[in-house]
Amino acid sequence: MTREIVIGGVKIGAKRPLALVAGPCVIESELATMRQAERLMTICNALSLPLIFKASYDKANRTSIGAYRGPGMREGLRILRKVKESLGLAVLSDVHSIEQVAPAAEVLDVLQIPAFLCRQTDLLIAAAATGRVINVKKGQFLAPWDMKNVAAKIASSGNENIILTERGASFGYNNLVVDMRSFPVMRASGYPVIFDATHSVQLPGGQGESSGGQREFVEFLSRAAVAAGVDGIFMEVHEEPEKALCDGPNSIALNDLPALLATLKAIDAVVK
């Protein structure tokens, strides 16, 4: 059994019911972010599903130099603070450098370490020192059993509020695959495990100057992950994925979310 992590009013791990981390890939505007957060809250309240809202203020690892990155840290954190204070939702976003950690920790309930940065020791230790919950995405280049070393870096600072997220492994060029064995392997570390169902169907750089995606497989992979006993599901959602400024090809339309979440909740109830 994994330890229980408390994030605002949300409890993850230790056989707690499935939790959802969801929101747009990137903050596109204050109005759109608030609208989507409210919609997500309504959907999750109807299903009694715990929700943590996610959105990035800066996508620092976009495929091309001309791709939209977001509003920047200052404006992005202001918008996330508004989501948190207006709607009462816990909020999560990425930190990409040590300099971002302190200001981000003033607003965010969860500091997320991107997959490409999951072995950056100084960043992990700086994030851990804030005492915030740390969600680390497993690098596409790492074996699941290697994540125990990543978690140990964070725990060395006395912070064991750690969540590990599976987001697929590199499978040749421009492709990812999900190894379902990774869930029990990473949960054996004692920390809750989340499955990133939308980034796992990404085709990195698959469109030349942007990443492609196969959202039609999100439902199948997320059902399998919940059946395998994950503690939470991470999904990027959008009102109109075809118009999203980032990761549209692998984002889920908000209109399609209620039915999928109802199925996942039912599977989780059987497994747990």
UniProtKB/Swiss-Prot annotation:
Q: Where in the cell is it found?
A: Cytoplasm
* One record GO biological process: keto-3-deoxy-D-manno-octulosonic acid biosynthetic process
Keyword annotations from UniProtKB, A to Z: Cytoplasm, Lipopolysaccharide biosynthesis, Transferase
Q: What is its EC number?
A: 2.5.1.55
Which InterPro entries does this entry report, sorted A to Z?
Aldolase_TIM, DAHP1/KDSA, KDO8P_synthase
Question: Transferase: is it a keyword of this entry?
Answer: yes
- Belongs to which family? Belongs to the KdsA family.
Q: What is this protein called?
A: 2-dehydro-3-deoxyphosphooctonate aldolase
The gene behind this protein is kdsA
